């Protein structure tokens, strides 16, 4: 049962967990990209646990799809503002390595295309920017 008062601290606690769990997949995604020249298609190709096994108190799952790491919040036990909502971590090539971003959910359609760094907004299930930590407010156009 949730406490009656739900301040911003409790919202951020769920987001912090989502970011920590998603960040735990970054090194595997980066390593895959640097070794193969393309983003991993899914959790298996990235060499991480299945989405349903990367969970937490507030996080339902963490999915790797075309190199984008997306955490989905639980639909219960969290504030209504983030119930079932998502945030993403994604990277772009930069000087022989990769630069990571964090923000509202994005998707990458084609991992083998020349523009395989491009991501676009994933329209559904966004956590409103005001409920995201200041360190996780990048947009799909971030560089």
Name each model feature, range by range.
Residues 1-4, 9-52:
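Conserved hydrophobic/amphipathic alpha-helical signal-anchor segments
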């Amino acid at each position: 049962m949730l406490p009656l008062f739900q301040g911003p601290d409790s919202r951020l606690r769920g987001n912090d967990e989502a970011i920590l769990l998603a960040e735990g997949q970054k090194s595997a995604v980066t390593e895959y990209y640097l070794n193969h020249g393309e983003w991993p298609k899914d959790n298996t190709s990235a060499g991480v646990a299945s989405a349903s096994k990367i969970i937490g108190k507030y996080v339902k799952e963490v999915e790797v799809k075309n190199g984008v790491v997306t955490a989905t919040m639980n639909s219960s036990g969290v504030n209504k503002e983030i119930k079932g909502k998502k945030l993403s971590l994604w990277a772009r090539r930069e000087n022989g390595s990769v630069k990571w971003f964090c923000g509202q959910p994005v998707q990458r359609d084609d991992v083998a295309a020349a523009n395989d760094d491009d991501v676009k907004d994933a329209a559904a299930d966004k956590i409103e920017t005001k409920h995201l930590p200041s360190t996780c407010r990048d947009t799909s156009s971030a560089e």
